[in-house]
């Protein structure tokens, strides 16, 4: 069993969280004529921004996060987007106005930190201060009155406070800004939209009340009957074999599935990033080797399985209880590389993660799957229509 000391270690604030004053890195807003502007609060590595921008009609103009390594990843993959590093509760109105300038904010999105809600969290409770960060989204709405608000969180929010917390968020969004919002909420499973992972997320979408079109959540596209779910084999089978603590930087084969072709669509010069295996002790290597694919590697941690080729991954986590590598590879005696974790989250291979193995796990585990975000974005665009400027 995990000890009290280990429990404390995995629930304390990470040293990678910025504790200084908020820092703005201002970029000249790119030309986005005919596209909608996006501000991504609590942006993390950028899964929401990536998926929404993949609609080709939405452009991120500002990303905000307290996690230093995640924001480095965000900036690397969004080089024309302004960023603020810091606690959203410490960012004053003037800094937001300086960051955004004269640009009208069309969409604000927030993957509000989930540790206070998540069923995986050892300290889950209604008093956790992180549960109230959504009020910072409300403050932002009052400043900029965006057309659409998107908030993402884990399914565990539904049961927090016997459902009262979920209701309170919807009511707070409904009355926000100068005109208020028509708010809908839905529990979506990323696997239903092509992500090779069972990842259920509670999504709130608010559309400003002066916009007459009604928002509807996207219908599932995969059902394992007419459109089979994406499997681990679909996602990972083209990536090079790795030994313990080995890195490979070029592909060894062509894509073997439609999903892999999508992941490699923008790869340049066959260059492969973030594909390094963890450095396991011999005991861990033997444990993975002796575990049947699809079964738990540890008796006390049923979600810590060795993946099988023909399934979807259970929900990826950012860290927490041991073993931190979380999943074993289906036919190699090791945990997953960051690239494999990114594939399971539907990040394409040209999306590069900054930081080492542990930070890569945190960033991929916290992220919104871009494929899920894109489907939400497509539904939002049905409401907004073409932007005329």
Model-predicted regions and their roles:
Residues 2-5, 254-389:
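C-terminal target-recognition/interaction regions appended to catalytic cores
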């Amino acid at each position: 069993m995990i000890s009290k000391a280990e429990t404390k270690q995995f629930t304390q604030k990470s040293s990678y969280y910025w504790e200084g004053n908020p820092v703005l890195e201002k970029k000249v807003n790119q030309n986005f004529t005919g596209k909608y502007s996006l501000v991504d609060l609590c942006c993390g590595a950028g899964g929401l921004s990536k998926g929404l921008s993949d609609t080709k009609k939405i452009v991120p103009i500002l990303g905000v996060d307290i996690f230093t390594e995640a924001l480095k990843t965000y900036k690397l993959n969004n080089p024309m987007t302004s960023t603020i590093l810091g606690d959203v509760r410490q960012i004053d109105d003037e800094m937001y106005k300086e960051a955004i300038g004269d640009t009208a904010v069309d969409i604000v999105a927030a993957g509000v930190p989930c540790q206070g809600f998540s069923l995986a969290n050892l300290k889950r409770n209604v008093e956790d201060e992180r549960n109230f960060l959504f009020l910072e989204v409300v403050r932002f709405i009052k400043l900029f009155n965006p057309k659409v608000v998107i908030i993402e969180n884990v399914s565990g929010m539904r049961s927090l406070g016997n459902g009262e917390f979920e209701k309170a968020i919807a009511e707070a969004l409904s009355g926000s800004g100068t005109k208020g919002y028509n708010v809908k909420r839905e529990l979506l499973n990323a696997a239903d939209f092509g992500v090779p992972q069972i990842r259920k997320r509670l999504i709130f979408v608010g559309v400003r009340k002066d916009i007459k079109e009604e928002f509807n959540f996207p219908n599932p596209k995969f059902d394992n009957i007419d459109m089979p779910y994406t499997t681990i084999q679909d996602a990972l089978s083209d990536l090079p074999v790795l030994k313990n603590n080995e890195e490979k930087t070029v592909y060894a084969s062509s894509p073997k599935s439609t999903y892999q072709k999508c992941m490699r669509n923008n790869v340049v010069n066959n260059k492969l990033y973030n594909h390094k295996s963890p450095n396991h002790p011999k005991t861990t290597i033997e444990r993975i080797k002796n575990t049947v694919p699809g079964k738990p590697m540890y008796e006390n941690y049923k979600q810590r399985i060795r993946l099988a080729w023909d399934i979807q991954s259970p929900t990826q986590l950012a860290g927490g209880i041991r073993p931190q590598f979380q999943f074993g590879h289906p036919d190699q005696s090791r945990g997953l590389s960051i690239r494999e974790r990114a594939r399971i989250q539907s990040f394409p291979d040209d999306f590069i993660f900054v930081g080492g193995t542990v930070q890569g796990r945190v960033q991929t585990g916290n992220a919104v799957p871009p494929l899920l975000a894109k489907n939400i974005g497509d539904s939002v665009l049905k409401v907004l229509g073409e932007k005329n400027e």
